[in-house]
């Protein structure tokens, strides 16, 4: 069977209704993306962890429906638009989807990733490239964080250089758990990973089991009281600014904090918010993204 992708862009208020209608009318799958992704207009969908998101699509959304090539896309989209209550049928484009061995193709796109001095992120279908490597076995999945994104890489390099044996670590916005797992493999003591997304929490638990890393995961309400030697948060600049007081309060006096998910042009603004609580500066920049690192002052 051959397939095509039907791609339409439309405002946020119509994206979810159109997606539901497309599925009801026979689309094989539907996804919604930020049409402004990787541009200055890109918007985070979620706000502060622990809060229920106020919206379920982006201001400028791209709806992508996978359809049978034998199906008339114009008829399908017109029917879906009518079902969703749209005043008119949105313009669309079609993309051909080639027949593929999807498992083999996916595996071929994820080779081992070398990070820092000794870290290797290795998919389960690969062997460790070096006998003395610090190996994290991680497959692509639902949760963010496989080591390929510059922000994840920056945080991993920072942790490799920073974590000392027995230190306590909080990974806030843990995604796949990659940073928490790395901290444990670097010799940390108690490690906690927190994420707003229950699917991410479950994925992180599974990844930790696979890597034999004893890490405690939970939702924001599960975050333990007390302070940590190290806090790392790889999120986005706006949530980081909102959570500055809370995140820095989790750092022991003299403890370390690292923040990423921050574009280089956003670094000064984020740093100025955190400077009220910690001595902080850009630690390293990579491909337009930065990792900010700081130390909590003795008096908070």
From Swiss-Prot:
Gene coding for it: prmA
Protein name, UniProt field: Ribosomal protein L11 methyltransferase
UniProt enzyme class: transferase
GO molecular function: protein-lysine N-methyltransferase activity
Entry keyword set: Cytoplasm, Methyltransferase, S-adenosyl-L-methionine, Transferase
Catalytic activity: L-lysyl-[protein] + 3 S-adenosyl-L-methionine = N(6),N(6),N(6)-trimethyl-L-lysyl-[protein] + 3 S-adenosyl-L-homocysteine + 3 H(+)
GO CC annotation terms, alphabetical: cytosol
Organism, scientific name: Burkholderia thailandensis (strain ATCC 700388 / DSM 13276 / CCUG 48851 / CIP 106301 / E264)
Disulfide bonds: none
Compartments, record wording: Cytoplasm
Taxonomy, superkingdom: Bacteria
Family listed: Belongs to the methyltransferase superfamily. PrmA family.
E.C. numbers: 2.1.1.-
Protein's job: Methylates ribosomal protein L11.
Transmembrane stretches, start-end: none
Residue sites binding S-adenosyl-L-methionine per the record: 152, 173, 195, 234
GO biological process: methylation
InterPro entries: Ribosomal_L11_MeTrfase_PrmA (IPR050078), Ribosomal_PrmA_MeTrfase (IPR004498), SAM-dependent_MTases_sf (IPR029063)
Pfam families for this protein: PrmA
């Amino acid at each position: 069977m051959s397939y095509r992708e039907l791609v339409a862009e439309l405002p946020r208020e119509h994206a979810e209704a159109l997606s539901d209608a497309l599925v009801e009318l026979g689309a094989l799958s539907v996804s919604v993306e930020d049409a402004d992704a990787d541009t200055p207009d890109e918007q985070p969908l979620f706000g502060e962890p622990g809060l229920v998101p106020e919206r379920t699509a982006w201001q400028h959304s791209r709806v992508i429906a996978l359809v049978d090539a034998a199906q008339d896309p114009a008829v399908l989209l017109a029917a879906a638009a009518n079902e969703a209550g749209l005043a008119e049928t949105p313009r669309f484009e079609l993309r051909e989807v080639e027949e593929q061995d999807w498992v083999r193709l996916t595996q071929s796109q994820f080779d081992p990733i070398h990070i820092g001095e000794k870290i290797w992120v290795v998919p389960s279908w690969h062997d460790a490239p070096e006998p003395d490597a610090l190996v994290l076995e991680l497959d692509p999945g639902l949760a963010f964080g496989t080591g390929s994104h510059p922000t994840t890489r920056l945080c991993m390099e920072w942790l490799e250089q920073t974590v000392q044996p027995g230190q306590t670590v909080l990974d806030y916005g843990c995604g796949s758990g990659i940073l928490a797992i790395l901290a444990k493999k670097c010799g940390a003591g108690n490690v906690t990973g927190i994420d707003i997304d229950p699917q991410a929490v479950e994925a992180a638990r599974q990844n930790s089991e696979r890597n034999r890393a004893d890490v405690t995961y939970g939702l924001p309400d599960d975050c333990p009281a007390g302070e940590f030697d190290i806090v790392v948060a790889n999120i986005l600049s706006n949530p980081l600014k909102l959570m500055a007081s809370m995140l820095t309060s989790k750092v022991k006096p003299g403890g370390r904090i690292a923040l990423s998910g921050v574009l280089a042009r956003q670094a000064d603004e984020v740093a100025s918010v955190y400077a009220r609580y910690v001595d902080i500066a850009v630690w390293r920049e990579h491909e337009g993204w930065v990792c900010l690192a700081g130390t909590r002052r003795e008096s908070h």
